A protein has these predicted regions:
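Single conserved hydrophobic/aromatic residue that forms the stacking wall/gate
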Residues: 210-219
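Active-site beta-loop-alpha junctions enriched in small/polar residues
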Residues: 32, 59-63, 115-118, 153-155, ...
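Alpha-helical scaffolding segments of alpha/beta enzyme cores, especially the outer helices
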Residues: 14, 18, 40-44, 100, ...
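Aromatic-lined glycan-binding groove of carbohydrate-active enzymes
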Residues: 182-209
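Structural detector of well-ordered beta-strand residues that form the stable sheet scaffold
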Residues: 27, 57, 149-151, 171, ...
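N-terminal binding-site loop/beta-alpha segment at the start of enzyme catalytic domains
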Residues: 1-66
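Glycine/proline-rich, positively charged
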Residues: 72-171, 175-176
Length: 219
């Protein structure tokens, strides 16, 4: 999607292709990433693969819109789209966001649909439960998604969402690593009790636990 550095279409394709060659078959994206560019690039790559051979997840909770605001466009380096995003956890916005994602991904269904960052404001959680979650349940009933998930960078709200008994999985970023293991205290036991799959993201804590090899060691 072009964050934090510019990524060309070719580099994006080569990266996805290398992952595929190494046996990776789960791909996660979101409207936020590159304001739609990530979904377009992932969709272009996966359109060349057998649909039954991969698992794809994307997210709802933000809508992409056209903008001439240069600062918004510059958030994602090298982004050729004049787009930005805004939070909206309403039922209608969730349905629209999902349909837009399908178009960008060139798919008629996705395997996992995550609620994305419903902790961005004090009332976001409330609106998500009344709107987005109901829309996701409807999409699952229509069999255009297989699993309902939620992706965020904190575990407290995920523990609360688990009590709704409609989530199949959570994507937790940066909260079960060598640095931060706070999810052990409450979230992981709840996931075990509720049979909710926990997907770990940001396992290197935004590269704090990882550095690229020096040119001398890069053999």
């Amino acid at each position: 999607g072009g964050w934090p550095v510019e990524v060309s279409d070719q580099i994006a394709f080569d990266t996805l292709n290398k992952a595929w060659e190494q046996g990776i078959r789960y791909f996660d994206t979101a409207p936020l990433y590159g304001s739609g560019m990530s979904e377009i690039r992932v969709g272009d790559f996966l359109s060349k693969q057998n649909r039954d051979e991969f698992v794809i997840s994307t997210k709802v909770g933000r809508l992409i819109f056209d903008t001439e605001n240069s600062k918004a466009v510059e958030k994602f380096k090298g982004q050729p789209l004049n787009k930005d995003s805004k939070f909206d956890f309403s039922y209608d916005a969730t349905m629209r966001s999902f349909e837009d994602s399908l178009n960008r991904l060139k798919l008629d269904r996705v395997d996992i649909l995550h609620l994305h960052d419903p902790d961005n404001s004090p009332d976001a959680f409330f609106h998500a439960k009344r709107g987005a979650v109901k829309a996701m349940i409807k999409l699952k009933e229509e069999k255009v998604i297989k699993a309902i998930g939620c992706g965020m960078n904190q575990n407290e709200m995920l523990s609360e969402l688990a009590q709704l008994d409609c989530f199949d999985c959570f994507l937790l970023a940066g909260r079960y690593t060598l640095i931060d293991q706070t999810s052990i205290e409450r979230l992981i036991p709840i996931c075990e009790e509720k049979n909710i799959t926990l997907i770990l993201g940001g396992i290197f804590n935004s590269c704090l636990l990882y550095t690229s090899p020096s040119p001398r060691d890069n053999r």
